């Protein structure tokens, strides 16, 4: 069965442009992905990141879902420690009520920002050091399932809308920790190979081997998220990859400005030490023309036993991002309006409705 192809859009701001332009580009690209037959598009949560326009994925989700007709739209993801589980439950129940069967909720454990900004989000030093992600996840699930113990102080709280369940839940991660937690909870799992490509195979295999079936997910479902740099030719792709290199170098040194342009990256005098540091970083982008990138991605997806591939790119220019979306749709042989996992998610939705009933 062909693997579904999905899109992670970080809503990057290229040097010399505005956040408004970045958001409008993301809308246009989502409409394009919808027309080409992509299965889902996700938006991330980042704070105090001047190079990224989306700090509130739930707002992007509502707008994009209203502008598209078939595409699933979700958070990739909401950083659970930054928010009260009750608030997340009510926000995504409402999104599900507005767009039934088209919303995804991906959950992450990282702050999505620096320490000071995380403190501003969480309001206490204790919250910064607490390793309570599993407890927060359990609380979110208990709110949705009305499954708090009889003596729990939250047992009488009913998230609104009360007659709508949460959409399908996914845990996001770049390590074995999140893979095991997703498996034990019987949830979907999305591995961030664009952050840690080397860890994809062991984490996804561990998830599948440890999976405990649940009413939400009778079977495991693993998404492999990869960064791709797709050029018109191999040489063009290698030229574009200079943007990735300069971006990674800036991220490593804490420079969080707008994404560099190709001209800016081409002028930068990389030292041998900087080249070595970039090569040693676990973040990786598959570079080449569309056929070369497809071959590399397919090989990793086969090795990791991924059920679905999700592509993103660190290239900020709209034309480069548009080419990536079009070319990946071509080499993955997408057919607009057809989804190879519609039946699977129909089963998941039916199970969720059975819980609600």
Listing of model-derived features with the role each one plays in the protein:
Residues 2-19, 81-147, 189:
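Flexible, glycine-rich active-site loops centered on histidine and acidic residues
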Residues 126-158, 199-306, 333-356:
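An alpha-helical appendage that flanks or caps ligand/catalytic pockets
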Residues 9-24, 78-86, 163-173, 281-290:
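Active-site mouth loops of central-metabolism enzymes
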Residues 20-32, 174-180, 290-299:
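Short, acidic/polar
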Residues 175-198, 203-204:
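A conserved active-site cap/scaffold subdomain adjacent to cofactor or substrate pockets
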Residues 5-9, 41-43, 73-75, 103-107, ...:
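Hydrophobic faces of well-ordered beta-strands that scaffold small-molecule active sites
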């Amino acid at each position: 069965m062909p693997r579904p192809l999905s899109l992670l859009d970080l809503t990057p701001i290229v040097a010399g442009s505005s956040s408004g332009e970045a958001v409008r580009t993301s809308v246009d690209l989502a409409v394009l992905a919808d027309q080409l037959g992509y299965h889902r598009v996700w938006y991330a949560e980042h704070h105090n990141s001047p190079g990224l326009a989306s700090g509130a994925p739930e707002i992007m989700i509502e707008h994009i879902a209203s502008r598209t007709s078939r595409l699933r739209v979700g958070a990739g993801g909401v950083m659970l420690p930054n928010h009260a589980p009750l608030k997340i439950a009510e926000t995504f129940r409402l999104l599900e009520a507005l767009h039934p069967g088209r919303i995804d909720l991906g959950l992450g454990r990282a702050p999505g920002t620096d320490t000071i900004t995380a403190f501003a989000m969480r309001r206490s030093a204790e919250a910064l050091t607490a390793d309570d992600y599993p407890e927060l996840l359990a609380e979110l699930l208990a709110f949705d399932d009305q499954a708090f113990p009889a003596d729990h102080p939250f047992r009488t709280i009913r998230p609104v809308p009360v007659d709508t369940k949460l959409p399908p839940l996914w845990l996001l991660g770049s390590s074995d920790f999140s893979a095991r937690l997703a498996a034990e909870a019987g949830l979907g799992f999305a591995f961030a190979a664009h952050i840690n490509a080397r860890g994809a195979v062991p984490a996804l295999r561990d998830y599948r081997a440890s999976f405990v079936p649940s009413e939400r997910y009778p079977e495991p479902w693993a998404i492999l998220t990869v960064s791709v740099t797709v050029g018109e030719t191999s040489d063009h792709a290698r030229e574009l990859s200079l943007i990735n290199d300069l971006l990674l170098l800036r991220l490593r040194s804490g420079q969080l400005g707008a994404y560099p342009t190709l001209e800016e990256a081409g002028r930068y005098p990389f030292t041998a030490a900087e080249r070595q540091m970039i090569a040693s970083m676990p973040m990786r982008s598959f570079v080449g023309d569309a056929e070369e990138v497809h071959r590399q991605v397919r090989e990793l997806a086969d090795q990791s036993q991924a059920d679905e591939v999700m592509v993103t790119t660190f290239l900020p220019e709209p034309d480069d991002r548009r080419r990536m979306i079009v070319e990946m749709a071509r080499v993955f042989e997408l057919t607009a309006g057809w989804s190879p996992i519609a039946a699977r998610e129909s089963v998941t939705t039916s199970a969720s409705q059975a819980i609600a009933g």
